[in-house]
Design a protein with these regions (language model features):
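Mature catalytic core of soluble alpha/beta enzymes
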Residues: 2-345
Length: 345
């Protein structure tokens, strides 16, 4: 691994997101038509295309986003996920057909990470304060209940799946955030008729362009700096970092500990030692899930890189990546499509 050097974003031409699009003047010229869904999944989405999105397609996109959140959001009291969490004796819950590939991906991630990625981690997130009301207050009984190791429900054992039907026997707090945003990006991308487009969902990018788009890799310690620049023409690049979503919890009058949302589902605790990750899936990926839903897979892998061994993930998924650890050392795979600002060792 090599230490990195920080390079400032040119202030007039870079967006400051975890996977930020650089060279905005060039992008505006190549894809001048912009459609924004500012509230989608809490982060917003911006779609740049080379030809206008007609009103019918935009309306269909809005309907899809609404349906998606109504089914999968644990922050909505009227969602299907919320209903599963309220079912005192569990039940059989039928999801839309479009959920099947998402569940397939979670099956694959659960297996590839030996359970470190698990939708049942929603219960741990709630105990740590990342609940529907965003209380950021840890429950008193959290230490005794966090993670599968302490008896929390487990995907495939306590939640069984039959196609797009999930069966439970008690209230279950599920969270599909590890790759849910990327999956919505893929579904929206399928609705576009433009030959060139970029969907930017707060760090999750799906790019189809004739010439590469420059993407700044944001430094998690200083969002005004980049640690590298990726160049992507066709594929998905997703970033993950706790710096965007973290809170402090008081242990006593003098001590606070930092909590974030990237949990290892096995012990239910925030992942340590990694500060940021980037995962890239090319448009010509060979694995069916990656070829059909590249952003979802890249999104899930960017999270999995925090809690699982890279070699273990590569036995299931074909991807390239970069990770930045807490000592400012960066690891990068061969063929990762970025130039990184490295210092000499």
């Amino acid at each position: 691994m090599r230490p990195i050097a920080k390079v400032p974003f040119p202030p007039s031409s870079w967006r400051k997101w975890a996977g930020s699009i650089g060279g905005m003047d060039s992008l505006t010229q190549r894809m001048p038509f912009v459609t924004a869904f500012y509230r989608a999944l809490g982060t917003g989405m911006v779609i740049s295309v080379d030809s206008p999105i007609d009103d019918k397609v935009r309306s269909a996109m809005e309907s899809l986003i609404e349906d998606y959140e109504h089914v999968l959001s644990r922050f909505r009291n009227d969602s299907l996920i919320a209903a599963i969490g309220k079912a005192e004796h569990g039940g059989s819950f039928d999801f839309p057909d479009w959920c099947a590939p998402l569940f397939d991906l979670y099956d694959a991630l659960f297996s590839a990470t030996s359970g470190a990625i698990d939708p049942c981690v929603g219960e741990d997130l709630i105990r740590l304060g990342y609940d529907a009301s965003l209380s950021f207050t840890v429950t008193q009984d959290a230490p005794e209940h966090l993670g599968a190791l302490r008896g929390r429900a487990v995907w495939g054992r306590d939640v069984t799946r039959h196609g797009t039907t999930l069966v439970t026997h008690e209230p279950m707090q599920l969270d599909f955030g590890a790759c849910g945003k990327g999956y919505l990006v893929d579904l929206l991308g399928r609705m576009l008729q433009s030959s060139q487009f970029v969907i930017d969902a707060g760090g999750d990018l799906l790019i189809h362009a004739e010439q590469p788009i420059s993407v700044a890799l944001e430094d998690p310690e200083d969002q005004s700096h980049a640690i590298g620049i990726a160049h992507i023409a066709n594929g998905a690049l997703c970033a993950s970092a706790p710096s965007r979503r973290h809170w402090n919890v008081a242990v006593n009058e003098r001590t606070q500990i930092a909590i974030h949302h990237l949990l290892n589902a096995i012990d239910g605790l925030p992942a340590q030692q990694t500060e940021a990750s980037w995962a890239y899936i090319p448009a010509n990926a060979t694995l069916n899930l990656a070829r059909d839903y590249p952003t979802a897979v890249a999104d899930g892998l960017a999270t999995a890189l925090f809690v699982s061994d890279v070699a273990q993930l590569q036995r299931t998924f074909d991807f390239t990546y970069a990770t930045l650890d807490e000592s400012r050392q960066i690891a990068v795979s061969r063929n990762f499509p970025a130039e990184l600002f490295l210092r000499s060792a």
